[in-house]
């Protein structure tokens, strides 16, 4: 039995659909398309600009950009894809953990 049939009829401005039958909205892929458009627009927004080439040929410069594959939510641009092994590994790269916390308080000074 349909419970909507007991309500008084009120004129509505939208399209009329049967209230007792389950009507499913057609599945659309809009969120996926919106996500792709957003990623493309963000990628297009970051255009590399060489401020000081330091005597190097600007055509030979290589630009690294942040990708979501290597995420770091605390400081996303600090650890820019530092490989820990493989062909791109370099010994002079600092791979140690960084402390981004608030420094601890000196409790002896606060007790007085």
Curated annotation (Swiss-Prot):
Keywords: Cell projection, Cilium, Cytoplasm, Cytoskeleton, Flagellum. The keyword Cytoplasm applies. It comes from the Eukaryota. Residues 1-34 are annotated as: Disordered. The keyword Cytoplasm applies. Pfam families: CIMIP3. It is found in: Cytoplasm, Cytoskeleton, Flagellum axoneme. Belongs to the CIMIP3-like family. This is Ciliary microtubule inner protein 3.
């Amino acid at each position: 039995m349909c419970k909507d049939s007991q309500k008084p009829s009120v004129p509505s401005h939208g399209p009329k659909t049967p209230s007792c039958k389950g009507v499913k909205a057609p599945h659309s892929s809009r969120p996926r398309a919106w996500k792709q458009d957003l990623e493309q627009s963000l990628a297009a927004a970051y255009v590399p600009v060489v401020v000081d080439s330091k005597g190097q040929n600007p055509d030979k410069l290589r630009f690294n950009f942040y990708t979501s594959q290597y995420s770091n939510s605390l400081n996303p641009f600090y650890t820019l894809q530092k490989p820990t092994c493989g062909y791109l590994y370099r010994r002079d790269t600092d791979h140690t953990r960084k402390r981004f916390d608030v420094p601890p308080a000196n409790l002896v000074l606060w007790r007085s």
